[in-house]
Design a protein with these regions (language model features):
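Non-cytosolic membrane-interface motifs at loop->transmembrane helix junctions
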Residues: 113-125
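Gly/Ser/Thr-rich beta-alpha loop segments that engage phosphate groups in nucleotides
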Residues: 128
Length: 166
């Protein structure tokens, strides 16, 4: 079996960052009121307008959609750095299911929130982007890790190649 090129300290840091991001997302996405997210959207839209960006990019609905994409990037990025064996397709599927479940909870249990299919699409896109970024990081770290004697797990290795040396 391959040795992870990530130090134990780095793995602990990534786990803590992932846990913190999950808590922040749960607090934001499952809050009974949309006042917090609406405040962030309004202020970010205003800040983007202040930068001189065109109205088509600073409309609150466009900003909300962008934030829905960005919110899910860290989940699959951090997850794929911690657990590189699942492919970007696996992480994207996990993101789709998680986003779908969030929207179901918003539709069924949170009267002040609105569930939309556009949010599921945006969150899934964010998960895909994060997973691809994680894959890219592993591709970059791969040759460096191999030089140090540590190898990245091969997603397509045969069972014999994955067995430890005897």
């Amino acid at each position: 079996m391959s040795v992870s090129p990530l130090s134990p300290r780095m793995r602990t840091t990534l786990r803590a960052a992932l846990a913190a991001w999950i808590v922040l997302l749960a607090f934001t996405l499952l809050a009974p009121s949309s006042a917090g997210p609406d405040w962030v959207i309004a202020h970010l839209a205003q800040a983007l307008q202040g930068l001189g960006l065109p109205d088509v990019l600073t409309h609150p609905r466009r900003v909300e959609n962008m934030l829905n994409v960005v919110a899910f990037v860290p989940l699959s990025l951090l997850g794929s750095l911690l657990w590189p064996r699942p492919s970007w397709r696996d992480w994207t599927a996990v993101g789709f299911v998680a986003s779908f479940l969030v929207e179901v909870v918003q539709a069924v249990a949170l009267d002040a929130r609105s569930a939309t299919h556009a949010d599921v699409v945006a969150n899934t896109l964010g998960t895909l982007i994060g997973a691809l970024l994680g894959h890219l990081v592993w591709r970059i770290l791969g040759p460096r890790a191999s030089e140090g004697g540590a190898d990245l797990p091969d997603r397509h290795a045969s069972a014999e190649e994955l067995e430890p040396p005897r």
